[in-house]
Amino acid sequence: MAGIVSLVILAVALFSFMNFDPYVSQVLALKGDADRGRAIFQANCAVCHGIQADGYIGPSLWGVSQRRSQSHIIHQVVSGQTPPMPQFEPNPQEMADLLNYLKTL
């Protein structure tokens, strides 16, 4: 039981941290443009995730916005903590555009 409680506390803390990160807050405050996001995806992500985002080296991203929170997606893109995915450093507007594009998948 103590293990479950600890796990829940850790999950809440991580979720809170990701939502209060200044970069994440900046991104989430912006209105993204799906067309610009698609161009960003094609230039940076399609090599691994496929031209249609249906997976290649990396997983399919269809429905990712329904499976993951926007904060989680932002963290995934900028952290590079899931090899072989590299760390990316999009500016806040580019990240907002990419998020908006991913919502269309």
Curated annotation (Swiss-Prot):
Q: Name one GO molecular function term.
A: electron transfer activity
Annotated binding of heme c, by residue: C45, C48, H49, M85
Residues annotated as signal peptide: 1-29
User: Would the keyword Metal-binding turn up in this protein's UniProt record?
Assistant: yes
- Name its GO BP terms in alphabetical order: photosynthesis
* One Pfam family hit: Cytochrom_C
Instruction: Determine the domain of life of the protein's source.
Output: Bacteria
Q: How is it modified after translation?
A: Binds 1 heme c group covalently per subunit.
What are the alphabetically sorted keywords of the record?
Answer: Electron transport, Heme, Iron, Metal-binding, Photosynthesis, Signal, Transport
PANTHER family assigned to the protein according to its UniProt record, in alphabetical order: CYTOCHROME C-553-LIKE
- Official protein name in the record: Cytochrome c-553-like
Originating species: Synechocystis sp. (strain ATCC 27184 / PCC 6803 / Kazusa)
Gene name linked to the record = cytM
